[in-house]
């Protein structure tokens, strides 16, 4: 299991998240097209539902549960017209420490990742995904809008997230994909997955050349090294 470490940069108007109640709700990046819950991941059929645009979303409950949803496009420097698409989903429990840091521990068997490389294969790669995360957290109430600003361990900023739902929009917080003693899923699902047909249309020329659009490339490159393949 890998761990990612992030810190938060506070703007002049930012305030620390002093309690869990400050985090409760569903947060999403500017597009607001990626939101946790049943519109992103279908646990019954064990499949992702592709949003119209890329983005990130986190949800937190008062009793210490969280859920996260990522849909990112990764630039291809060799062939800019063939970006990769990555969808990730996790949920589990979180702890807000006295120093303001936030520790997120996922349910190991439930996390999912889908990687689509449309120029290399007509099928996407579907795997289990399990990665513990640690953040320092505060909220920026700029102009009265509740906003969550995160920075990575190297002080590079992540995309800000805005409060979109309160109470949060989430799937059940219990284990959704239990495994047997052999480590195999108790639920039989198809392993051939649909590719992400819209990924080429999600990135404009400006986005491909703007480095601020690709803050997560290094994070995903690191995360891919810690993934366990999802066997039937």
Curated annotation (Swiss-Prot):
Leader sequence residues: 1-17
The residue spans the entry assigns to the Cytoplasmic side of the membrane are as follows 232
Which parts of the sequence lie on the Lumenal side of the lipid bilayer?
18-213
What is the annotated localization of this protein? Endoplasmic reticulum membrane
- The species is Aspergillus oryzae (strain ATCC 42149 / RIB 40)
| Protein name in UniProt | Protein rot1
Sites of glycosylation? 52, 130, 136
Q: Which GO terms describe its biological process?
A: 'de novo' protein folding
Query: What keywords does the record list, in alphabetical order?
Result: Endoplasmic reticulum, Glycoprotein, Membrane, Signal, Transmembrane, Transmembrane helix
